[in-house]
């Protein structure tokens, strides 16, 4: 689905908010350290990556509403294709934790959060070309305590 400019910017803002919230949640669960918390922490990390990629989709005027559509977006937009292997690794780790009840250790969460940072670094430059206010939005979100 194609978005008009106002909806695109609103989508960028919403997805960046979800990105920041999921990173913060993953970090909180990591600090908790309980086995179930660690499994959900890698899932939150995956969803952080998903939302920063979807912020880019929104900036391009494209609404992605499923994982399948997300895969098509990667194929149709090679400028962000470098993100796909890292994104896919996060997705697989999340699915292992959620669907197969695979045990996670703190280092798995730390690795997942590093992968999220890699996705952010790769996507933000592209995102700012289409939504120059994205960095300001992200800075404001990170500077605001979220509860």
What feature does the model see in each segment?
Residues 1-147:
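Terminal alpha-helical segments
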């Amino acid at each position: 689905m194609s978005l008009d400019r106002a909806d695109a910017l609103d989508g960028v803002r919403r997805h960046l908010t979800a990105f920041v919230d999921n990173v913060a949640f993953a970090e909180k669960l990591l600090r908790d350290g309980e086995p179930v918390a660690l499994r959900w922490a890698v899932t939150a990390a995956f969803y952080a990556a998903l939302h920063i990629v979807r912020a880019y989709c929104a900036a391009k005027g494209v609404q992605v509403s499923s994982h399948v559509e997300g895969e098509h977006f990667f194929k149709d937009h090679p400028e962000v294709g470098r993100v796909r292997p890292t994104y896919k690794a996060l997705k697989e780790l999340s699915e292992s934790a959620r669907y197969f009840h695979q045990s996670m250790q703190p280092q798995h969460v730390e690795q997942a959060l590093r992968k999220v940072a890699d996705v952010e670094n790769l996507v933000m430059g592209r995102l700012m070309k289409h939504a120059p206010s994205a960095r300001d939005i992200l800075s404001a979100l990170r500077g605001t305590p979220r509860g």
